[in-house]
Amino acid sequence: NTWTRAMMLQGAEATLIPTYTPIRVDEENMTGSPVFLGGINVYLNYRSKLWRKLPGFMKHWLNAPWIINLATKFGVSNDAHELGALTVTLLEGDQGAEGREIEELAQFLGSQLKPDVICLSNALLSGTIKKIKEHYQGPLFCILQGDDVFLEELGEPYRSRSLELIRNNVQQVDGVLVHSDYYREFMSGYLDMPVEHFHKVLLGINLEGHDGTPDDRSGEPFTIGFFARICKEKGLHNVVQAFEIFHKAHPDSRLCVGGFLGKESEEYFQETTKNLNALNESYKYWGSPATREEKIAFYKSLSVLSVPTDYHEPKGLFVLEALANGVPVVQPAHGAFPELIEQTAGGLLVPPGDPQALADAWERLYQDQEYRLQLARQGYERVRQFYNAELMATESLSFFQKWVDAAGLRQNTPQLTPDP
């Protein structure tokens, strides 16, 4: 959504196409089409051969955003363990249960929208590539942002079959986009494709409203923050263990946790935080901020942010958001984090999975407020210089234009179609 908006502000015609569910954002929603491959219909197609054969007018009403949103409120699971067979049928494309829905998307793109460039938002949409290329001859890309994490949670035989299908599908795109050098190298090996097929594109954030500034926070409790989706992979348990160590030495310190909590992670969350509830004001769960302003207020309340993931994070958007509000970070030395810390100079790296090392890094920032402020200032300035949405749009438009020119699709104003 941020990417689409930034390109539009630079004069490109960009259409954001929601798939599976309506797009949920904490800023202006740039959605430019109906929902395709609506989640309810995808599931019913998979479960019922009769449903697949129904005419479109009898099914399309279930793609209405309010209906899909209502369905998700009743605990529709997105747990990868339960979605193995459905994932496979999506990746099988026109050979699977979703063939008619995929054909509708392909016709919309190739016959109605007619963009100069198409970018699919994840590997699970790669089952649409074959059909799209029957209706569209321009450059086609797929961006990867952590697809391996989902795939690795699939039970067998679904994991192996899904990986096989993705490897075959993405061979057909002109390139695969990623946000870090780490992920470029990793996914090259994971998908068994030449690294030259992968292209790094800048990750940027919309700085509007991020009005936090580096502050010595003198007189305020030292507050540690965790902001990410609540699940084991994101490492909340690592933060809790480290905070228990740190809080013993500094009883006035606080831990603030924010992020979406799905039903599949409720048991993990309760077990992980059960000892924190006795700390009263020293611990607070903010939930998932309902607005952009609430999210920014969360960041501004912190002395330091840590999201010590167990998995290797491919981009680290929360790092940029914290730094944009003058909050330094302490992160594990894996995934995209070393690149981000090196380029922003806004935080510290610690050995992964080591709560004591994490607590020691917080201790360093607690004891040396000037050093903490130095990291905050450096990160604050460099995010604005190197990771803003305008620069992201400029670089990606330049990248896409080269492919448009090479394909002979020259227009004064390129029309770009990034998927969500």
What are these regions, as identified by a protein language model?
Residues 182, 204:
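Carbohydrate-associated surface elements
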Residues 343-344, 348-355, 364-369:
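Conserved acidic donor-binding segment of nucleotide-sugar-dependent glycosyltransferases
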Residues 16-107:
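A conserved catalytic-core segment of Leloir-type glycosyltransferases
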Residues 254-270, 285-288:
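Glycosyltransferase donor-sugar binding loop
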